[in-house]
């Protein structure tokens, strides 16, 4: 059953979250706004909201089929989805399958090296501090999550990685790394939240001699046309799983 937005709860860089008539359900509205480097670079990618909403809807539905609990309920429009109301943990969980991005800059590594087993990192969601990398001990010190929750986040992230690698392979893409966010439901259970899209996943097409970027790095580093890149990801997803709204 569709719910109309009633009160804007939160507006972030890429989405707006609204209350609905049902306190257990929020409406998530995706925007075309694009940011990088902790919002130091700003712009817009035409159609990004629709791409990210539709891709995320399909990915969340796929993950639910694989037994991964998440907040997705239904896609109710091109840029809108209904989600479960959660208390979002102030952590980003990053899983890396190859060296890329900030990991290379931070540790002086060559880009594109395989990482086995995958690397799991935690970042404190705090714009004023620049979302710093934190250890489980830092998380305990800051009381961001319990040790048991941190352990659960790590195990969930690795399980999600296995499923996402299979999903993106079906779209003829390699999942280099990605960012996850989680929240707690009314029972205190941890559910996957936020989005899974070219904004949050580093996706390479390795069909040629050199990897071809099809993600937010197109905008972040001016590597090509982000509109075309995002639309290509959407078309590959739709070809792989079908083009119907997941109602």
UniProtKB/Swiss-Prot annotation:
Keywords: ATP-binding, Ligase, Nucleotide-binding, Purine biosynthesis
Catalytic activity: 5-amino-1-(5-phospho-D-ribosyl)imidazole-4-carboxylate + L-aspartate + ATP = (2S)-2-[5-amino-1-(5-phospho-beta-D-ribosyl)imidazole-4-carboxamido]succinate + ADP + phosphate + 2 H(+)
The keyword Protease is annotated on this UniProt entry: no
GO biological processes: 'de novo' IMP biosynthetic process; cobalamin biosynthetic process
Pfam assignment, any one: SAICAR_synt
EC number: 6.3.2.6
Domain of life according to the entry: Bacteria
Coiled coil: none
CDD domains membership: SAICAR_synt_PurC
EC supergroup of this enzyme: ligase
UniProt pathway: Purine metabolism; IMP biosynthesis via de novo pathway; 5-amino-1-(5-phospho-D-ribosyl)imidazole-4-carboxamide from 5-amino-1-(5-phospho-D-ribosyl)imidazole-4-carboxylate: step 1/2
InterPro entries (UniProt xref): SAICAR_synt/ADE2_N, SAICAR_synt_PurC, SAICAR_synth, SAICAR_synthetase, SAICAR_synthetase_CS
Family as reported in the entry's similarity comment: Belongs to the SAICAR synthetase family.
Annotated protein name in UniProt: Phosphoribosylaminoimidazole-succinocarboxamide synthase
Organism in which the protein naturally occurs: Synechococcus sp. (strain JA-2-3B'a(2-13)) (Cyanobacteria bacterium Yellowstone B-Prime)
Name of the gene: purC
């Amino acid at each position: 059953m569709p719910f109309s937005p009633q009160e804007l709860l939160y507006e972030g860089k890429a989405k707006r979250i609204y209350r609905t008539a049902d306190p257990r359900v929020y409406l998530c509205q995706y925007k075309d706004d694009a940011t990088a480097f902790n919002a130091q670079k700003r712009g817009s990618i035409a159609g990004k909201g629709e791409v990210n909403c539709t891709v995320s809807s399909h990915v969340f539905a796929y993950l639910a089929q694989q037994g991964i609990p998440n907040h997705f309920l239904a896609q109710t429009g091109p840029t809108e989805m209904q989600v479960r109301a959660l208390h979002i943990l102030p952590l980003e969980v990053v899983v890396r399958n190859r060296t890329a991005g900030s990991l290379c800059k931070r540790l002086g590594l060559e880009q594109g090296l395989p990482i086995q087993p995958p690397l799991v990192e935690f970042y404190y969601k705090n714009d004023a501090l620049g979302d710093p990398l934190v250890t489980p001990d830092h998380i305990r010190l800051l009381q961001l999550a319990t040790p048991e929750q941190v352990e659960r986040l790590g195990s969930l992230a690795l399980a999600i990685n296995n499923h996402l690698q299979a999903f993106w392979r079906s779209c003829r893409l390699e999942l280099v790394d990605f960012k996850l966010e989680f929240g707690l439901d009314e029972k205190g259970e941890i559910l996957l939240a936020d989005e899974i899209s070219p904004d949050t996943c580093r996706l390479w097409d390795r069909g040629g001699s050199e990897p071809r970027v099809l993600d937010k790095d197109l905008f972040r580093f001016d590597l090509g046309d982000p509109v075309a890149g995002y639309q290509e990801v959407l078309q590959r997803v739709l070809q792989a799983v079908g083009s119907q709204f997941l109602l």
